[in-house]
Amino acid sequence: LSDEAVKQGKKHQVLLMIDMGDLREGIWFTEYDQIRDTVKLIEDLPGVELYGLGTNFNCYGTVMPTVKNGEDFLAIGHKIEKELGIHIKRFSAGNCTSYVLIDRHQWPKGLNHLRIGGLHEYGIEYVAMHYLDQYHHSTKDVMKACSPLYKLKAEIIELDKKPTVPVGELGVDAFL
C-alpha cells in the first residue's frame, strides 16, 4: 500500500481494525503489542496515514455494542496515544448496529466515527428493529431487514488465527 501510494503521489488514509470480540476483522483486542507495533509501522510508512482505529460489533459474531466494549476499545487507543506520543483522530466504533447506543443516549464519549450503510439507506435501527424517526416509512413495522442493496467483490487481504467463539454480550448477526 505504501509503495503504491508513493508511486501514485498519494496519501492513503488507513483505519486500523481491532477485533473487540465479534470475530469480524482486525487484530484481536488482547494482542496489545501487535496493535501498538502495527500503529508504529503505519506511522513510519511513506504515503500512508493512520486515519484512526476501528472496530465492529453485532456483525459476524453477534457481539452487541455496549458502553463497556466501547470504552475498552477507547482505552486501547488512549494507551497507544500515550505510549507513542501521537493523536488518534478517529475512533470508529462499528457499523449500523452500533447506532443503538446513540439511539439510547449511551454512546461512549470519545467514539467519534461510525460506518453506516443500511441504516442510512433504509432508516432501520437493526438491534431493536425499528425505523428511525424522520424517514417517510418510520411509522411502519419492520418486516424484513434483508435487501439486495449492495454487491461486494473483494480479495482476501488478511488471514489470522482467532478464537472460534465471540467474546461479549450476544445479539443477532448481520446476516438476518
Predicted features by range, described:
Residues L1-H87:
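Active-site-proximal beta-alpha core segment in soluble small-molecule metabolic enzymes
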Residues K68-L176:
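Active-site anion/phosphate-binding pocket segments in diverse small-molecule metabolic enzymes
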